[in-house]
């Protein structure tokens, strides 16, 4: 067998904490439950456990450091290898210590806080009430200016008959006979001894024998509540407002849950949102685009905005009106109003209009259509022989 320090991949001067951490990591990696039927993993697991058994014991480690593992022959658990998996598993369980140091075996097997095993569920400590979610629609204009909305929500509140105790009298609350008031029971599963919430009292440690008739022993009843929600200017769809303490009542003196308000901004008939900017498509005639004009455009700040459209303006041109967009919801600056030009091609022309357009077309020259001229020049260049 290789050197014990090499097996655990630690330095010879490693601290007990470093040795324990290294062992835990490797032991979980090669644990038989994670590697069923893998003989090599089983062998590695025994070697790792033997190395830890020696290096975690101060006296054995001193002997090993001075004289090697041969000097440990005959010592319990050291020097002669773990002949059975039971010995290795006992070392494994001892290393995790059932919660010593704030860690649990479930943290290493991917169980997080052990809740799926019942290790930390329940309990009699203060617990926060459940949080709630509501969706609220606001108009485009309300999102620009901000608005106050009234909501009606249903939350669990303390029963005003039993004051949240759940019992009609103090004599109606008894210590749980199953867990003797601990709120937890122990269960042995193979090599593992697990702590679970008591199934009789659900981790409370007490049972109610004389339940309150108003709340049916729950200690809380559902109540409707009218609340006012301030929607700040600049909100957008998908944003969330948190209202602390507007969820269900807490248990055992714990704080109430929170209310999360999810915003949905309704679309507008003529405006669109682009970040904090507001986009407006402005239709103008062919003549207005060619000759230029002045236009008054609407805004959501109730202020008339005038823009000057110069002659020769092309379709899709955007004019920017500063400060007429959405305010930043965090309070820093405002977006702009973007006016995008849409040049309409005339339809349903009269004979006279057609004649005039035909006459105009005959008078057009390359200088009137610079983009087309440039395009035709590129086409000629493309097809011309070298």
UniProtKB/Swiss-Prot annotation:
Family note: Belongs to the DnaJ family.
Comment on bound cofactor: Binds 2 Zn(2+) ions per monomer.
Cofactor: Zn(2+)
GO cellular component, one term: cytoplasm
Chain positions of all zinc fingers (CR-type): 146-224
Family annotation (PANTHER family): CHAPERONE PROTEIN DNAJ (PTHR43096:SF48), DNAJ HOMOLOG 1, MITOCHONDRIAL-RELATED (PTHR43096)
Subunit structure: Homodimer.
Gene Ontology process terms (BP): chaperone cofactor-dependent protein refolding; DNA replication; protein refolding; response to heat
Taxonomic classification: Bacteria, Pseudomonadati, Chlamydiota, Chlamydiia, Parachlamydiales
Name assigned to this protein: Chaperone protein DnaJ
UniProt GO molecular function: ATP binding; heat shock protein binding; unfolded protein binding; zinc ion binding
Function: Participates actively in the response to hyperosmotic and heat shock by preventing the aggregation of stress-denatured proteins and by disaggregating proteins, also in an autonomous, DnaK-independent fashion. Unfolded proteins bind initially to DnaJ; upon interaction with the DnaJ-bound protein, DnaK hydrolyzes its bound ATP, resulting in the formation of a stable complex. GrpE releases ADP from DnaK; ATP binding to DnaK triggers the release of the substrate protein, thus completing the reaction cycle.
Gene this protein is translated from: dnaJ
CXXCXGXG motif repeat spans: 159-166, 176-183, 198-205, 212-219
Organism the protein comes from: Protochlamydia amoebophila (strain UWE25)
Record-linked Gene3D superfamilies: DnaJ domain, Heat shock protein DnaJ, cysteine-rich domain, Urease metallochaperone UreE, N-terminal domain
Pfam families: DnaJ, DnaJ_C, DnaJ_CXXCXGXG
Binding site for Zn(2+) 1: 159, 162, 212, 215
């Amino acid at each position: 067998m290789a050197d014990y320090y090499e097996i655990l991949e630690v330095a010879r001067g490693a601290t007990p904490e470093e040795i324990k951490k290294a062992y835990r990591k490797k032991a979980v990696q090669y644990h038989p439950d994670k590697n069923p039927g893998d003989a090599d993993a089983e062998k590695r697991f025994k070697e790792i456990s033997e190395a830890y058994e020696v290096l975690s014991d101060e006296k054995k480690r001193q002997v090993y450091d001075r004289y090697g593992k041969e000097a440990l022959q005959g010592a319990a658990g050291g020097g002669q290898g773990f002949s059975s998996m039971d010995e290795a598993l006992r070392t494994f369980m001892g290393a995790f210590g059932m919660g010593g140091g704030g860690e649990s075996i479930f943290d290493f097997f991917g169980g997080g806080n052990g809740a799926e095993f019942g290790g930390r569920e329940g309990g009699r400590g203060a617990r926060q009430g459940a949080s709630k979610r509501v969706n609220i629609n606001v108009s485009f204009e309300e999102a620009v200016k901000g608005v106050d909305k009234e909501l009606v929500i249903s939350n669990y509140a303390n029963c005003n008959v039993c004051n949240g105790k759940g019992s009609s009298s103090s004599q109606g609350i008894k210590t749980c006979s199953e867990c003797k008031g601990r709120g937890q029971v122990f269960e042995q599963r193979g090599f593992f001894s697990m702590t679970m919430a008591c199934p009789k009292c659900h981790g409370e440690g007490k049972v109610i024998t004389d339940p309150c008739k108003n709340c049916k022993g729950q200690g809380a009843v559902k109540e409707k509540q009218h609340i006012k929600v301030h929607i700040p200017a600049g909100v957008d769809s998908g944003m969330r407002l948190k209202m602390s303490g507007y969820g269900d009542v807490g248990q055992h003196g714990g704080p109430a849950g929170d209310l999360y308000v999810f915003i949905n901004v309704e679309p507008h008939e003529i405006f669109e949102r682009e970040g904090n900017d507001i986009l407006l498509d402005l239709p103008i005639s062919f003549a207005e685009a060619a000759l230029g004009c002045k236009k008054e455009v609407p805004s959501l700040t109730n202020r008339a905005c005038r823009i000057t459209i110069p002659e020769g303006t092309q379709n899709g041109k955007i004019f920017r009106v500063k400060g007429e967009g959405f305010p930043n919801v965090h309070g820093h600056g405002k977006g702009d109003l973007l006016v995008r030009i849409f040049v309409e091609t005339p339809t349903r022309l009269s004979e006279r209009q057609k004649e005039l357009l035909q006459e105009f077309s005959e008078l057009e020259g390359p200088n009137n259509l610079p983009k087309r001229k440039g395009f035709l020049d590129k086409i000629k260049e493309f097809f011309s022989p070298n």
